[in-house]
């Protein structure tokens, strides 16, 4: 089902609030656990999601020396998560060691490289980070680096997904945050696109958070997203 390609973030500070969201949105099959909740609740939230037979996107964005990144990825496989993130800028060696580290697991997660945070715009890339590339070119270079090392896919802005799909091929997973329905505000995401447009551009999964979870009626918001995607 197309709805199974929507990942909803549990971007709340406590385990109790996370459970409340799970209870409120039982039809959501794929949930993202990020830094805030994981630091607060620890592996307990992953165990709860597994008990409820939900798919898990563990979005901790590992970025450290190669040995540490590899060890963190190896530890994460023990929780049975489906998707796991690390920064492409950790470098070729860290990416390669991460791939090797999870290869011995019974059901290893798909590794996703963060190409560039969707909150970063072209001015920040050039003037703050001193990277002399346009956003699409930089995102492509990071995705290609990840693909060369055996990483399964990338997290990227929907603005870059069409180019990445064309260059990286159909087997490279593309997960897009920065997806906003036509009726939702962009918030702090700079490079956004509607769910239908992102899927048509080549995204495998969409991360849609605040338009659903902070809506006055989250259940209604979820249904509206599903209705939009029914067009695809």
From Swiss-Prot:
Query: What residues bind substrate, as annotated?
Result: 11, 32, 59-68, 118, 180, 189, 209-210
What EC number is given for this enzyme? 4.1.1.23
Q: What is catalyzed by this enzyme?
A: orotidine 5'-phosphate + H(+) = UMP + CO2
GO MF annotation terms: orotidine-5'-phosphate decarboxylase activity
Where do the TM regions start and end? Answer: none
According to its UniProt entry, the protein's GO biological process terms are: 'de novo' pyrimidine nucleobase biosynthetic process; 'de novo' UMP biosynthetic process
- Organism's domain of life? Bacteria
Q: Tell me if Lyase is a UniProt keyword of this record.
A: yes
Describe its function. Catalyzes the decarboxylation of orotidine 5'-monophosphate (OMP) to uridine 5'-monophosphate (UMP).
Q: What is this protein called?
A: Orotidine 5'-phosphate decarboxylase
Organism field: Gloeothece citriformis (strain PCC 7424) (Cyanothece sp. (strain PCC 7424))
């Amino acid at each position: 089902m197309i709805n199974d390609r929507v990942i909803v973030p549990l971007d709340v500070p406590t385990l109790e609030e996370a459970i409340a969201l799970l209870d409120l949105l039982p039809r959501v099959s794929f949930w993202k656990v990020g830094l805030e909740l994981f630091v607060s609740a620890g592996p307990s939230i992953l165990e709860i999601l597994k008990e409820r037979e939900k798919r898990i996107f563990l979005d901790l964005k590992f970025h450290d020396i190669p040995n540490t990144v590899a060890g963190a990825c190896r530890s994460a496989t023990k929780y049975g998560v489906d998707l796991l993130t690390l920064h492409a800028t950790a470098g070729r060696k860290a990416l390669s060691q991460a791939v090797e580290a999870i290869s011995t697991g019974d059901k290893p997660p798909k590794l996703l490289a963060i190409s560039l945070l969707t909150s970063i715009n072209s001015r920040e890339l050039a003037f703050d980070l001193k990277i002399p590339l346009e956003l699409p070119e930089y995102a492509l270079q990071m995705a290609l680096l990840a693909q060369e090392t055996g990483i399964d896919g990338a997290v990227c802005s929907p603005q870059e997904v069409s180019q990445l799909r064309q260059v990286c091929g159909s087997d490279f997973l593309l997960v897009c945050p920065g997806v906003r329905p036509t009726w939702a505000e962009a918030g702090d995401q700079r490079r956004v696109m509607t769910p239908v447009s992102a899927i048509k551009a080549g995204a495998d999964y969409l991360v849609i958070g605040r338009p659903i979870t902070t809506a006055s009626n989250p259940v209604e918001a979820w249904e509206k997203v599903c209705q939009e995607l029914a067009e695809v």
